[in-house]
Amino acid sequence: MSRFKLIKKTKAGIRLGSIKTKRGVVKTPFFMPDATRGFIKLVSGHDLKKIKMGPMVINTYHLFLQPKMEMIKKAGGAHKFMSWDNPLLSDSGGFQVFSLVHRNPEMGKIHENGVKFRSPIDGAWHDITPEKSIQIQFDLGVDMMVCFDDCPPNDYSKEKIKEAVLRTISWAERCKVEYGKQIKKRKIKESERPLLFGVIQGGVEFDLRELCTKELVKIGFDGYGFGAMPVDAEGNFLGEILEFTANLIPEGSLRFALGIGSPSDIVKCARYGWDMFDCVIPTREGRHGRLFLRKRNYKFQIPNSKEFYETINIGNSKFAADFKPINPDSKIPELREYSKAYLHHLFKLKEPLGARLASMNNLEFYLELMEKIRKSS
């Protein structure tokens, strides 16, 4: 039985729906910040609860290496370890493992059974297989999990990308089998089982994206993710291939645009029919003093939504004497009460409070953006 309900498709192409998870219902489309290692830098769980943050993404690879699974299991799972009550999605860690190995072959080797790699933390060697990745994600106790996949750079030859596609399909099948075994072993009810996502690889090749999607759909998953970087080797956004891939995924399945992205890219992809997004952009940009701000008195409209916001660099000298609030419309008291001049001062002194406030501003902006997308017609 599907846990995703597609309620309506708007004239702009936005898919309005809902997902039932063990920890509540989530409206789609939605954005998840990356709490990669079990936290968002400089932002506490209480900060996140204040802005009503929903699901977040954690990373299997990073948590497996530190604090290691024994510690998380002892804590009672990732939710208890993090003191987080809302849904969590675990990324399989495939992107991180393969980035490590592709950048430096001395750090590991890909084989048909999985990947052997050296920990960049302590130099210890580890083997991750599709089965082990699923077992770890069940131990994390997440609400949504992602199959282990082979994630090559987009500038690889078509032949090498095809090898990764075929390996990804094979591993997805093994992940699905192990997923079934874990459900049975742990006696998990249908209403409480974590959702499982297959990952569509294929680089910039349309035919390989199509091949991968069709084979994954035959295996059958709750949702399907767009794998690898959403830009080509020159940094151009892969809008055409993202739209093409979204249309290959069954209407009744969730569509997860992994690693996307900027506010304007999220709007584009929501129009293409993607339901879920995650990225480090709001918090990473915030830590570097770049803030997303809604233009006041501007009505948000999907076709020209890029004009709905501006990005400012609070470190610029023009903000040194700007005593207007950081964001007068924010629900966060500090953002309404502190001035841009004060935030500029904090960044000049490298005071962590500045990065925290900027990160909170951007997270709130993203949540409001998704709400406006859901309410647009």
Language-model features and meaning:
Residues S377:
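Histidine-centered catalytic/metal-binding microenvironments
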Residues V280-R296, E307-R374:
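Gly/Ser/Thr/Ala-enriched C-terminal appendages of enzymes
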Residues G13, K184, K299-P303, E307:
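Charged/polar low-complexity intrinsically disordered segments
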